[in-house]
UniProtKB/Swiss-Prot annotation:
InterPro entries: Cyt_b/b6_C (IPR005798), Cyt_b/b6_C_sf (IPR036150), Cyt_b/b6_N (IPR005797), Cytb/b6-like_sf (IPR027387), Cytochrome_b (IPR030689), Cytochrome_b_C_euk/bac (IPR048260), Cytochrome_b_N_euk/bac (IPR048259), Di-haem_cyt_TM (IPR016174). Belongs to the cytochrome b family. The keyword Transport applies. Component of the ubiquinol-cytochrome c reductase complex (complex III or cytochrome b-c1 complex) that is part of the mitochondrial respiratory chain. The b-c1 complex mediates electron transfer from ubiquinol to cytochrome c. Contributes to the generation of a proton gradient across the mitochondrial membrane that is then used for ATP synthesis. It comes from Equus grevyi (Grevy's zebra). The gene is MT-CYB. This is Cytochrome b.
Length: 379
């Protein structure tokens, strides 16, 4: 009798993807974040489903329905905070996952990389719409400011904004459609994740050295399942510490005030994971220019495979490129800090310099460092 794991049409697919999958023998802990992202997605879908059972997407009752979840629903508070802080964990894992792809040259798997960029954009859109749902002050004004950016598009801008709003301002129609999209998008993300994995398993995983590892593969289970479980336990520890000790650490106090279109908060800012892009947007005094810079700050990832000039795939043996990479990480942290600061001196000039540096590092210094390293190889 053949093993059901290898003969059953459905179980066979799971077996080839997670059990008997040949994996490089030397992949480090930086490769844990793919599985952690999968866990985060499952957590977000499950907690989101339970929240949706009690949430009402109406401007008059949305805020009080979230309060009701926290006060009256059994363990509603923990579900709500797991969902809110789970999004933060999701983005931490996402940024590390993208950073690892950059560092070790995983972007040479073009299809996997491009699907990954689409996934990043979709997750960002989902998180933005989710932030609007509690209908607090920052929810309302965040939605107003960010959707209003589309009015910078020549000719069709204003019509487009009113079409998204479903009226002449952010109101009931906007909240209802954002809830609908926020509910459906995670399932679209799940489908994209499957495509992402499909393309990855066509080529096999990259590894820290960046050289082909076909001659030295080990089965995914038990080696990497155990390794991933360790990463998962650390993620759960971090998430539960955040949820149980300081659930509002990463939130905004303004969101505990019900939305009021007549009162603008002193500092409108998005969640922490969007602050780097928000800082780039604010650093350009022109509206359309700012919007373009905002979009390019993410889409520039699609250019990275084209800008790869090195003869080596990974940065493991390229100290100059490593310096540029860590400068980029420091620059992104600076942008994140600046995005949360008020628009005044000296933050404005720091933000502008950090934005110029961000694009310069990717477009100029990374290819330049690679070219210098190529020439050094000849010596």
């Amino acid at each position: 009798m053949t093993n059901i794991r290898k003969s059953h049409p459905l179980i066979k697919i799971i077996n080839h993807s997670f059990i008997d999958l040949p994996a490089p023998s030397n992949i480090s802990s930086w490769w844990n974040f793919g599985s952690l992202l999968g866990i985060c997605l499952i957590l977000q879908i499950l907690t989101g489903l339970f929240l949706a059972m009690h949430y009402t997407s109406d401007t008059t009752t949305a805020f009080s329905s979230v309060t009701h979840i926290c006060r009256d629903v059994n363990y509603g508070w923990i579900i709500r905070y797991l969902h809110a802080n789970g999004a933060s964990m999701f983005f931490i894992c996402l940024f590390i996952h993208v950073g690892r792809g950059l560092y070790y040259g995983s972007y040479t798997f073009l299809e996997t990389w491009n699907i990954g960029i689409i996934l990043l954009l979709t997750v960002m859109a989902t998180a933005f719409m989710g932030y609007v749902l509690p209908w607090g002050q920052m929810s309302f004004w965040g939605a107003t400011v960010i959707t209003n950016l589309l009015s910078a598009i020549p000719y069709i801008g204003t019509t487009l904004v009113e079409w998204i709003w479903g009226g002449f301002s952010v109101d009931k129609a906007t909240l209802t459609r954002f809830f609908a999209f926020h509910f459906i998008l995670p399932f679209i993300i799940t489908a994209l994740v499957i495509v992402h994995l499909l393309f990855l398993h066509e080529t096999g995983s990259n590894n820290p050295s960046g050289i082909p590892s076909d001659m030295d593969k080990i089965p995914f289970h038990p080696y990497y399942t155990i390794k991933d479980i360790l990463g998962l336990l650390l993620l759960i520890l971090l998430l539960l510490t955040l949820v149980l000790f300081s659930p509002d650490l990463l939130g905004d106090p303004d969101n505990y005030t019900p939305a009021n279109p007549l009162s603008t908060p002193p500092h409108i800012k998005p969640e922490w994971y969007f602050l780097f892009a928000y800082a780039i947007l604010r650093s350009i005094p022109n509206k359309l220019g700012g919007v373009l810079a905002l979009i390019l700050s993410i889409l520039i990832l699609a250019l990275i495979p084209t800008l790869h000039t090195s003869k080596q795939r990974s940065m493991m043996f390229r100290p100059l490129s490593q310096c540029v990479f860590w400068l980029l990480v420091a620059d992104l942290l600076t942008l994140t800090w600046i995005g949360g600061q008020p628009v005044e001196h000296p933050y404005m000039i720091i933000g502008q310099l950090a934005s110029i540096l961000y694009f310069s590092l990717i477009l100029i210094f990374m290819p330049l460092a690679s070219t210098i390293e190529n020439n050094l190889l000849k010596w």
